[in-house]
Amino acid sequence: MENKSNCIFRKANEQEVAKLTELSIAAFHTDYLVGGDELDGPPGYDDKRWHFDMQKGGHLYTFLVDNKIIGGAVIFIDKNSIYIGRIFVDPLYHRQGYGVAIMEAIESLDNTISSFHLDTPIKNIRTNAFYKKLGYIETSRDTECVNYKKIK
């Protein structure tokens, strides 16, 4: 990524839900290429209604570069922490720093919050390495997922 000044991360609007759903599907389907058992994703990843509900609840975010939607996130904010439900980037923009930019934007949303939590599938080598690179520490795991936490 050459220039962060052309990037915008903000709450999604209703008109963006269809595009964000499309990008979510495309992004999560690439997980199949890095260890996923099938073309699949987290609950609701391929459901426009689910994304619409997340948007109405204020949890769906849009990531734009040069005013083009290239990714998004679903996050849940409380007074002390942020749970990162998922991030996704258009596969055409993978490995260009935009995932890092989204994570940095999330971590900068509210400077009073210093605790960030997320989980990712055990089998997804790419996302586990990505979150560790960003300073997230494994807190627990089960048969499906690894749970991570970061304190700023």
Annotate the PLM regions:
Residues 7-22:
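A short beta-loop-alpha structural element at the N-terminal edge
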Residues 22-50:
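Conserved GNAT-fold acetyl-CoA-binding loop/helix
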Residues 48-62:
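A short helix-loop-beta-strand connector motif used in the catalytic cores of GNAT acetyltransferases and
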Residues 62, 68-76, 83-88:
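Conserved beta-strand in the GNAT
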Residues 93, 97-105:
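Conserved acetyl-CoA pyrophosphate-binding loop and the N-cap/start of the following alpha-helix
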Residues 94, 117-128, 144-146:
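Conserved beta-strand-loop-alpha-helix junction that forms the acyl-donor binding cleft
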Residues 100-101, 122-141:
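Conserved active-site alpha-helix within GNAT-family acetyltransferase domains
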